[in-house]
Regions:
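Long C-terminal interaction/binding lobes of large macromolecular proteins
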Residues: 1-2, 6-204
Length: 204
């Protein structure tokens, strides 16, 4: 859309890449919208980059305006540091379809432990897993992710019907995984995803 070069992606991709001007585009309502993209650098020749939506959001109906609010609200066993009070609340959501249980587990783990990731604004040159979950569907999952991350369910579940989110920003972030043949292992977190689950997700 910007430079006239062909966009690249697989048949089920909802975000297409222009390798010429290093931009990414999501097709919405018959037109292409630019997507901000970052990556966390990986190491090793067997690195595959899996996409995640990093969504900055503020909650209504519950006190959820910063990462510190999230840690308190979900009762995480972490010390709330002063800098967390000024840190935007960012949900990390798989940008690929996968079984609901795995989807929620990945969202919970990566949202809680997002301090492990230090993205830089660039698109990986190769080994990109396709984006098969649109940003709009990732936004729709935020309530479920909040509920899934909450350790003391009775603190949050009764309020969920009245919860909504203001979306401030979103970025597509490619995280590095090591392909072991049977699993994909996230290089910073050591979280593993069974490759059969990824294959199944391509058929959802």
């Amino acid at each position: 859309p910007r430079c006239g070069w062909n966009l690249e992606g697989e048949r089920d991709s909802v975000v297409l890449i222009c390798s010429n001007c290093e931009t990414a585009w999501e097709a919405l309502e018959g037109k292409f919208n630019r997507v901000r993209v970052s990556k966390v650098s990986g190491t090793g020749g067997s690195t595959v980059y899996l996409p995640f939506w990093k969504i900055s959001a503020s909650g209504k109906g519950l006190p959820l305006h910063s990462f510190a609010d999230f840690i308190r609200l979900t009762n995480q066993p972490r010390v709330v540091r002063r800098e967390m009070e000024n840190q935007e609340m960012r949900f990390w959501v798989p940008a690929f379809k996968i079984r609901p249980k795995v989807f929620l587990n990945l969202s919970r783990q990566f949202t809680v432990s997002q301090h492990n990731f230090h993205p830089e604004e660039m698109i990986p040159k190769k080994n990109l897993y396709p984006v098969t979950l649109p940003q709009s569907e990732a936004v729709q999952s935020l309530k479920m992710i909040l509920a899934g991350a909450t350790l003391n369910k009775k603190d949050v579940l009764p309020h969920l019907p009245n919860v909504s989110f203001d979306i401030m920003d979103s970025t597509l972030v490619y995280l590095p995984f090591t392909d072991t043949g049977h699993e994909m292992i996230q290089q910073q977190m050591r979280t593993s995803i069974n490759k059969n689950s990824l294959e199944f997700g391509r058929r959802l």
